[in-house]
Amino acid sequence: MNAWEVNFDGLVGLTHHYAGLSFGNEASTRHRFQVSNPRLAAKQGLLKMKKLADAGFPQAVIPPHERPFIPVLRQLGFRGSDEQVLEKVARQAPHWLSSVSSASPMWVANAATIAPSADTLDGKVHLTVANLNNKFHRSLEAPVTESLLKAIFNDEEKFSVHSALPQVALLGDEGAANHNRLGGHYGEPGMQIFVYGREEGNDTRPSRYPARQTREASEAVARLNQVNPQQVIFAQQNPDVIDQGVFHNDVIAVSNCQVLFCHQQAFARQSQLLANLRARVNGFMAIEVPATHVSVSDAVSTYLFNSQLLSSDDGSMMLVLPQECREHAGVWGYLNELLAADNPISELKVFDLRESMANGGGPACLRLRVVLTEEERRAVNPAVMMNDTLFNALNDWVDRYYRDRLTAADLADPQLLREGREALDVLSQLLNLGSVYPFQREGGGNG
């Protein structure tokens, strides 16, 4: 059956700032306390969506979350009106204010893990929300992510959206950023690779930085998504590269159709994994980048592998890269060698995503891949699909509500909270989502 990959990109939120919240993500730590530009961040992301949509790659948008998220501050014991809560937390515990103001939901590769209908036992598209248990600021995302996905994939005959796994370390799940799918055409059954960093009883794990994904979580997600057991491989990420800043697998590998583009050191027991894939995936091609060409350190600093590998109608592939790759002589030299070599990659597309990159999120972090048949695509909420009208409406919306300068101190401004709620109220109507945000259901909005 014919099917297409639709990239659902996260729209950067109004409180995008640099707080260094993500230990193990070296860009996040390095840019801590720098001044951010939320308006520019949102526009950089929107431009990527529009350019790819114009090039014929189906694109859609997933909206930001409510931030600062006051209900969590109340759970932490701060009392009073919303304004009083903001004032108290800013004075007594500013780190909590930064955490509940994080715009991290923009990286929707961590929103959920997807199983296309061609891979599932019941023939539905399954989406399991990620619990993002390893980082407090990200663990807050799951309930609203679930509401948003149910508003976008709202046809229960075709889509099953599953709640996140329990919030415990044993079941730490980081979503599609630790998941790849390999196979022929999108509509054909594929081989799903669930990548984990640690498992109970196995001493092979990183020592410097945390392994955010557990094998136990990956196995549970595969069950929830009803993936045919014959179409699943569980693979461990190389703990040594986690300790070098590869906090998700999409920082060291990316797949599309029959191609796996990865670093030579991406996986534990890599030669064994690739042999297994060659035996089980027709036409499988591994493009392994040797450490002598690109070091793990350079891969992390440029986000070479946090790229999007997209299929054109003629079977060739485009690699979507951050500008940092072009600015690194060694990486750019390797990429031009790659273009000249015998493989399906025939085009490089470069985007300026510096605002997201400075927090450790490249092109692949910003998108959730969902393979859909034509019938399934028609069942998706049409208001989120990117086109000229939506692009212009979202640009105008960003111009109206987003600030062009934000520091950690600005997060305590009650006006920022009011601006954010008004903006999301308008956006949820524009995208026909209903009342997906807690403040709307509490009577604070019109959505």
UniProtKB/Swiss-Prot annotation:
NCBIfam families: arg_catab_astB (TIGR03241), PRK13281.1 (NF009789). The active site is at 174, 248, 365 (nucleophile). Pathway: Amino-acid degradation; L-arginine degradation via AST pathway; L-glutamate and succinate from L-arginine: step 2/5. It comes from Escherichia coli O127:H6 (strain E2348/69 / EPEC). Belongs to the succinylarginine dihydrolase family. Homodimer. Keywords: Arginine metabolism, Hydrolase. HAMAP family: AstB. InterPro entries: AstB_sf (IPR037031), SuccinylArg_d-Hdrlase_AstB (IPR007079). It catalyses: N(2)-succinyl-L-arginine + 2 H2O + 2 H(+) = N(2)-succinyl-L-ornithine + 2 NH4(+) + CO2. The keyword Cell inner membrane does not apply. Gene3D superfamilies: Succinylarginine dihydrolase. Its EC number is 3.5.3.23. GO terms for biological process: arginine catabolic process to glutamate; arginine catabolic process to succinate. This is N-succinylarginine dihydrolase. Catalyzes the hydrolysis of N(2)-succinylarginine into N(2)-succinylornithine, ammonia and CO(2). Pfam families: AstB. GO terms for molecular function: N-succinylarginine dihydrolase activity. Substrate binds at residues 19-28, 110, 137-138, 212, 250, 359.
